[in-house]
């Protein structure tokens, strides 16, 4: 479980403002509901909306504070959608009442409904969407490396395609292919026609190679693009080609096609990085 860090909220203007407004709105609806329940009949359904929304707000605080929005965004949108239904129904049952306490509670539920709509639009959008990139960019210069200990799930946008990274062709010697030669007298093979004295001298036609085929990815020489990390990423320890980086870090990128980009850090470390964790500058 990623570590909860209050600076993830305090350094993000969008998260700080929406969470603060939601807490104020919940307090208004809660106090208004208490007064209305004491003075007159109060719909029990509204109490469920009050209890449900405090749980949703607490969940948002935990998700944003631990920098796991990419992991739990689908669940968050589902809970917010249900909360929007509850708050709007509570508004409908209170806003038309003559008691000022009920109207105050309705005002709190209206604010909660507005915040729910904003959150659904934010958490329901992909990190590549323009409005979300604009919102996230506001926090980059303030938070810095506060998200260093978090690691969103890299499998969220699918496995890395094998064709997205170029790799030099592997050359094999005849010694490495020993055992694959055919013993049948077939013409057209480099060893010559059947009966030729060069038939079994295939191994001498190729110079021996002392270097084993490498699985390392070829490194480009130019990095014309610059990108900034909108999330922290920890490289897979089983994949030597991936690199780790922290939120707000600037990387040099050689190719922006595909879901994995060849990137270089400021310390000279090179490797591949998931494109949905980066934003081009």
Swiss-Prot record:
Residues 201-219 have a biased composition (Polar residues). Coiled coil: none annotated. One of its GO terms (cellular component) is plasma membrane. The chain crosses the membrane at residues 15-35, 45-65, 75-95, 104-124. Its main location: membrane. Residues 178-219 are annotated as: Disordered. Keywords: Cell membrane, Membrane, SH3 domain, Stress response, Transmembrane, Transmembrane helix. It holds the Pfam family SH3_1. Residues 222-281 form the SH3 domain. Gene3D superfamilies: SH3 Domains. One of its GO terms (biological process) is regulation of actin filament polymerization. Residues 36-44, 96-103 are extracellular. PROSITE patterns: SH3. Residues 1-14, 66-74, 125-281 are cytoplasmic. It is a multi-pass membrane protein. It is found in: Cell membrane. It comes from the Eukaryota. Plasma membrane osmosensor that activates the high osmolarity glycerol (HOG) MAPK signaling pathway in response to high osmolarity. Belongs to the SHO1 family. Forms homooligomers. This is High osmolarity signaling protein sho1. It comes from Talaromyces stipitatus (strain ATCC 10500 / CBS 375.48 / QM 6759 / NRRL 1006) (Penicillium stipitatum).
């Amino acid at each position: 479980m990623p570590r909860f860090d209050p600076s993830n909220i305090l350094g993000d203007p969008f998260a700080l403002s929406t969470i603060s407004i939601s807490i104020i709105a919940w307090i208004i609806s809660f106090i208004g509901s208490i007064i209305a329940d004491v003075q007159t009949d109060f719909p029990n359904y509204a109490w469920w909306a009050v209890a449900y929304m405090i749980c949703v707000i607490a969940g948002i605080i935990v998700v944003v504070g631990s920098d796991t929005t990419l992991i739990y965004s689908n669940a968050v949108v589902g809970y917010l959608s249900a909360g929007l239904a509850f708050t709007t129904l509570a508004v409908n049952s209170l806003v038309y009442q003559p008691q000022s306490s009920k109207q105050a509670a309705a005002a709190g539920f209206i604010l909660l409904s507005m915040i729910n709509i904003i959150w659904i639009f934010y958490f329901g959008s992909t990190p590549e969407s323009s409005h979300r990139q604009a919102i996230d960019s506001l926090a980059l210069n303030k938070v810095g490396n506060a998200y260093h200990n978090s690691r969103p799930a890299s499998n969220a946008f699918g496995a890395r395609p094998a064709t997205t990274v170029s790799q030099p062709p592997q050359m094999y010697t005849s010694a490495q292919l020993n055992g694959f030669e055919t013993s049948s007298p077939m013409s057209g093979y480099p060893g010559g026609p059947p009966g030729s004295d060069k038939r079994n001298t295939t191994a001498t036609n190729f110079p021996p190679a002392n270097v084993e085929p490498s699985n390392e990815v070829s490194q480009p020489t130019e990095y014309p693009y610059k990108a900034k990390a909108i999330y922290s990423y920890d490289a897979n320890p089983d994949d030597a080609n991936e690199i780790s980086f922290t939120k707000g870090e600037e990387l040099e990128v050689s190719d922006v096609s595909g879901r994995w980009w060849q990137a270089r850090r400021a310390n000279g470390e090179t490797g591949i990085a998931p494109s949905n964790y980066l934003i081009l500058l």
